[in-house]
């Protein structure tokens, strides 16, 4: 199911000279959010805040120790977040932990029927230089995701950071696979989450 956004306007005020937006958003899993605002932008920002309180993001290294064990740890983390009200999960679609996490969400859809997978890509064709096996896994999660968000129209190093910023700004929790030392996109995202004071569940070496 695709998310559906509808709205209409009415005239308000003593002289009927003010416009009020009556806004309704139905998410991919059927959850409904309604609000009113003076502009459509105000309504959408209010919706995004509501969604962020129901959302978690993933970040992690491309090299993963014991992929099968890590996948089970991710599933446990998803179930834990689900029990605490999380329904939307954002993944970046990169090789390694991102792919494992996205596949874990998809594998739990029969068990947790209202969870939503949103893939956030830095630019179109980020899989261009993936190895064939990784490309196949990427296209599988890309095609099965409930939504795909593209943050930039073309390749740039900044696009990767914009992707990470987008996920953090739309989430209230972070599920990470971070060794605590390495620099790069995972470290950047964890530090952004720390700055925002988000709960972080680090699955590296069985930590949750």
What are the functions of these language-model segments?
Residues 3, 15-16, 32, 46, ...:
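Intrinsically disordered, low-complexity regulatory regions of eukaryotic regulatory proteins
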Residues 28-42:
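A short, exposed loop/beta-hairpin motif centered on an aromatic-Gly-Thr core
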Residues 1-22:
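Short N-terminal "domain-start" leader segments
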Residues 52-208:
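Acidic/glycine-enriched connector segments
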Residues 15-19, 30, 112-114:
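Short, solvent-exposed loop/turn segments that connect beta-strands within catalytic domains
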Residues 38-52:
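Mixed-charge, Lys/Arg-enriched low-complexity segments
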